Amino acid sequence: MKGKNPVSIPKKYQEILFSIGTYAEKLGTKAWIVGGAVRDFYLGRDTLDIDLSFEGNVDPLAGFAVKRWGGSKNKFSQFSTFRVNLSTGLKLDMVRARRESYPRSGVLPEVTPSCIKDDMFRRDFTANAWALSIMPGSFGASFDPFGAQKDIDAGIIRILHPKSFLDDPTRMCRAVRFAGRFGWKLAPKTEELLKEAVKQQYPLLLSRERLTREFLKINKEKEIKRILEMMRAYGMLQLVYPGLEWHDGLNRVKTVDERLGVMVCSLGKSGEEFLKSMRVKKELAQEILEAWKVSESCHAPLRALTPMQQAVIRAVHPGRKKYALEPCFLRGRD
């Protein structure tokens, strides 16, 4: 049975966070750790990324952190958010507590400054709607207005309100990503609403960039097989790209780039179009494209393949002979 203070801030972060909380108090504002970091602290998982929410101006607090511990800060003015990379290795997303409203589905929200409870309510799932105070007089105190601890203990992914997937369809991808990562399940009502969101094709309301970004996050997950199987079962994969399925070759590669290469090659003739839709860096796209061309061809490559290209082709075509991947240099009229 957990005690009254069920989650604690790791000692290695306490000095920095206590100092930020103390400075926030001097400025007359309240400060909290929010989101996934609190969840991970509770689960005993290490993290170097911490979200902080303030009920006041963030600018001087971001400046204080960089001046005190060194590093850099970048401001994202649309949401008054600062990304602070400290020289200690700790990464802080420092935001103004806010309320969000969505003018229409699939677009970024309109925001207004607000309190910590409203800031919790704008979160994707109850498990991420948990806050810890970093104020001097209440350092580490838990604020759990929507039952985060209870749902984490039960291994449940639960949205906070019925319009959640309509407001932000990226939450559909995050629901299966977190469920796969932690081995959790969707709450019955959340699952019902997700199925309806798939039926209504909510993900297609997103820009291709936002949908791609969420899928590439899934591609980085250790439990990618479990996640893709969930997406297939719910009909979500076909909304990312028609014909996309789990391929056993994904078990035979090690890197995120190789995974993407396997997906491209496993799609056959439509692989090139899928690759273009992913909008990855030009150099990576070209490397995968060359692997796809060899994968689709019955001929040996005209130039030496990179280790990544070889790994992808062997994963998709485990029966292809080694010599078939060696370059064929043409001479004369041959």
How would you name each of these model-derived features?
Residues M1-D334:
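Catalytic cores of the polymerase beta-like nucleotidyltransferase superfamily
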